[in-house]
Amino acid sequence: KFKFYYFLIVPFVLYILLKYFIFFEEYIELGKLDGLNWVETGAWGGLSLTFIISFFCLIFCFPIGMAFALGRRSGFPLIRYISIGFIEFWRGVPLITVLFMSAVMFPMFLPADFFIDKLVRCIIAISLFEAAYVAEVIRGGLQALPRGQYEAAKSLGMGYWRMHIFVILPQALKLVIPGIANTFLALVKDTPLIFVVGLLEIVGMLNLAKTNPEWLGFAMEGYVFAAIIFWIICYAMSKYSYNLEQKYKTDR
């Protein structure tokens, strides 16, 4: 399990190091990586880009959503209002608008010598957008727990963080496995929207390929293939979610 995560995370970490640290740039210029051409993220595309965006958005949006779910139920008014404002703002804006703002408008407010890659900006934008929905799903699980669980944890002398980490959140997350899975499925199926900002994942590549005269008349086959790929991914996620429900017996 952890080896699989390392296989996905290490390339991303290496990209950040190679992109933003002078040492690695000099390392390339010296020819120690001779024969390897630098590929900008704007040239990335296809199914691999779909996987990259989906994976990093999934691992980023979940902890952010959990934090704002707890913040919305906080006893401190400032934290609660900030959390409510964050959730309601992102839930009230269409994802396509969020992507357009992150790719086109946001760089205008940055200093001239400061640059954030378009792909990174889109991943951050999608993560924040989906985090608002994850927060509401988790909040539903927190509200479903009886108050006796909180009182029992406090009677054992647990503080706020220990109570939520060891008692409240494990139970709440088990209750909302279907809701979280549904949000993650929607995230994966929303990745084709990045086509509007010039990033070509699998559907974007199909839209580009069908304009090629050599591929005229084959657009239907391409879209059917893409639909099958998305169905396989979503079915696998749904099946895994169902197995988790059965493992933790969330319906009892």
Describe each PLM feature range.
Residues 1-252:
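Transmembrane alpha-helices and adjacent helix-loop boundaries
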